[in-house]
Amino acid sequence: MTTKPRHPEKVNKPLNPIKKKPDWIRSKLVNSKEFFLTKTIVNNNNLVTVCQEANCPNITECWSKRHATFMIMGDTCTRACAFCDVKTGRPGKLDSLEPVKIAEAVKKLNLKHVVITSVDRDDLDDGGSNHFFEVIDQTRKRNPNTSIEVLTPDFLRKGDAYKKVLEANPDVFNHNIETVPRLYLKVRPGSRYFSSLELLKNAKLVNKNVFTKSGLMVGLGENKEEIIQVMDDLKAADVDFLTIGQYLQPSVRHHPLDRYYHPDEFKELETIAKSKGFLLVSSTPLTRSSYHADEDFAKLQLNRINNH
């Protein structure tokens, strides 16, 4: 019996050798009691995490702090982004019990801040926005003191579906821009740069109190001028929080890594972004959307108060 490939769309792609990681990319290996407790809670509830599915380099550190980013609506994505390690294919039916399972897992982990993301579900009429609403709603009912951050797909061609997510009143609305517009056709072929910008802009118009957030990867072949243009575009969309991290090539079939940025370059990008007026900027090689999200949410709240 042959095993179905995780990325069938990449089977015939040319092989791109993976460059050796520099010393500053090494992630921490922590196998603490808390790590295994987090793993047990996730597994026992049959939950999916982006930590596992996207092969995140920070998983041991985060799980040792009982931080896990839940990925809802299954483990199979309808898009085929060239950078992503999440499985591609035809997803199954939504799990109607998932909202309660997520809420209970948040309670067991005693999370003060939770990040909930999802695969793209282009097969659903609403892109999964109603399911997002239910997950947020159930999580809040069972964990009234937990702040909730969502990392959503773009809801491309789904009209006002995104408004249903905002109706649930998440504390942070995150949608990653991922890369510069020139690289979209190669890196995010199923997405549109300006649609993602519009989503972020509209999110703030629909809910002026929500913190908006977006992430950018570097090392895909972009240049500094293009990165700065993305910063300007995100600021014009009234985005509060920008994250910048190093692209790490998941396999030889994925988009080739152009280069590793030095930590000093990340510092420089952080300085430039801060000068643009973002409420918060996180720019390090291992920065990911949900990395230190709980601490960053506290900083966002403080910075908003101080800016008024």
UniProtKB/Swiss-Prot annotation:
Its EC number is 2.8.1.8. [4Fe-4S] cluster 2 binds at C77, C81, C84. [4Fe-4S] cluster 1 binds at C51, C56, C62, S290. It is an enzyme of class 2 (transferase). It comes from the Bacteria. It catalyses: [[Fe-S] cluster scaffold protein carrying a second [4Fe-4S](2+) cluster] + N(6)-octanoyl-L-lysyl-[protein] + 2 oxidized [2Fe-2S]-[ferredoxin] + 2 S-adenosyl-L-methionine + 4 H(+) = [[Fe-S] cluster scaffold protein] + N(6)-[(R)-dihydrolipoyl]-L-lysyl-[protein] + 4 Fe(3+) + 2 hydrogen sulfide + 2 5'-deoxyadenosine + 2 L-methionine + 2 reduced [2Fe-2S]-[ferredoxin]. Keywords: 4Fe-4S, Cytoplasm, Iron, Iron-sulfur, Metal-binding, S-adenosyl-L-methionine, Transferase. GO terms for molecular function: 4 iron, 4 sulfur cluster binding; lipoate synthase activity; metal ion binding. PROSITE patterns: RADICAL_SAM. CDD domains: Radical_SAM (cd01335). Binds 2 [4Fe-4S] clusters per subunit. One cluster is coordinated with 3 cysteines and an exchangeable S-adenosyl-L-methionine. GO terms for cellular component: cytoplasm. Its cofactor is [4Fe-4S] cluster. InterPro entries: Aldolase_TIM, Elp3/MiaA/NifB-like_rSAM, Lipoyl_synth, rSAM. Residues 63-279 form the Radical SAM core domain. It is found in: Cytoplasm. The keyword Chaperone does not apply. Pathway: Protein modification; protein lipoylation via endogenous pathway; protein N(6)-(lipoyl)lysine from octanoyl-[acyl-carrier-protein]: step 2/2. Belongs to the radical SAM superfamily. Lipoyl synthase family. HAMAP family: Lipoyl_synth. This is Lipoyl synthase. The gene is lipA.
